[in-house]
Amino acid sequence: MKGRSASTAWRIPVILTLATGVGLGVFTMVAHGQNTASGQRFEEPAPPAPRDPASNLATKIGAPLTVVTVGDVMVKRTGANLEAPEFQNIFKLLKDADVTFGNMEGNLSDLEHFNGPLRGMMGDKDVAPSLKAMGFDLMNRANNHIFDSDKESMFSTIAQLDEAGIAHAGTGKNLEDARAPAFYDGPKGRVGLVGMHTPNGANTNANATYRSGNLGGRPGINALNYDVIYNVTAEQLAAIKAIRRAAYTPPAGTTNVTRLPDPAAEPADKVQFLGVWYKVGTPGTRSFEMDAADLRENLRSIRNGKYLSEFMIATCHCHQGPITAQQWLFEDQIPDFLPVLAKKAIDSGADMFVVHGPHVVRGVEIYKGKPIFYGMGEFYYQWQHMDSALLSGSWPQNGRADDSTIDVRVSAGLRPINFESMVAQTKFDKGKLVEIRLYPTSGAWDGPISQLGLPRQAPPDMAQKILARVQALSKPLGTTIAIENNVGVIRVGAQSAPSTGGLQ
């Protein structure tokens, strides 16, 4: 059962300075190992052997530990007090966990006192306390909706989560603040969190920047930037290179021309033309190259966070997919950089890696005994739950709100699959992963608008469909998922027991 405790205070070492002449003299004699009474010199003790870094990067909670993770939380109304079993069965998973994590996708504020422009997703002041009461301990904030209502919405959400006692990572007043790990001090130990976002090109204005001297930096997200590379055949790449040469061949007599790179100095299988990269690969797909500095500094933050905690979660909000033409709402395939990022994060000390952002579920992988969730889907999905002021601000081209703007199923082009998700319950014992249970959830695509997007236990036929999908997506990753009583079960350790009835 989840307990709550105040954050542990830091213990700051006290440094005593020897300020007097006598003190300095004594210090000098001791430092040189000289006994003034006998003239005997003392051997200085050998320095202690450096600690094995692996001990600091290991899972340090030996007691049984249950971590529950969910995907995106876009919430206007939590429904936490709804007594129907299909709701409470899901909420109980969150409450009973030792640690509960989700991605706080929308924004929160006290709307009566909010001074920013109202646009996009905004929940009222009672949402954060309700999420806390439901069991949320840690939330990611690095995502593409933090500036829906400009920077004011980011700061108001920070204030709301702080007041509710929910630790959060991924945004801040500058990049140092946004990239720093957050911590939750629970009964089983301290849990750290580093939150990242791989922004789309249009969203880089939300990227936080470093402070420099008296310049405070720009507020925003902890971004992991990247280059997109479109894959083409070798013949197509040669044609692109020829087109580039032709485009940059000036008429005779032209001065001050732009010089192309020396073809001999370029990679044979890759070229950039008009700001777009191309390389030889499978046509119709794209690859991603992470920014080296962003990757290095995020891994450093994960490593530092693990040094200061007993358990570490690394998380990334990612909308990218490998298939160029696939609509972003339905990208169930994993882009090539995500496994690299997840495994480097685990090698840097993360005990689990959680991806959110895809509006559908993806597969699960186990790497070195640590879980990687490549797509958790939508937990709360309440775009449509907006006050009239927010509606008019979100869709100014529509004038007055009507049925097509209020019903997100019409206005956003969503499908039932976007409302079929899961809750992951991960169990550790003696610092080792033992078992993962996947509980399917439904956002009630066929239900009334007032309850659309509220998470509830999926009915049996839908549960089987969701689990079969995750099972198929996980198989190429080397993960076997058993489906028992409408629950997906991944058994890792010998202590894992058969499922005895799901959410009862």
Language-model segments: which ranges?
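Acidic, metal/ion-coordinating pockets
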Residues: 23-26, 30, 34-504
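Bacterial N-terminal signal peptides
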Residues: 13-25
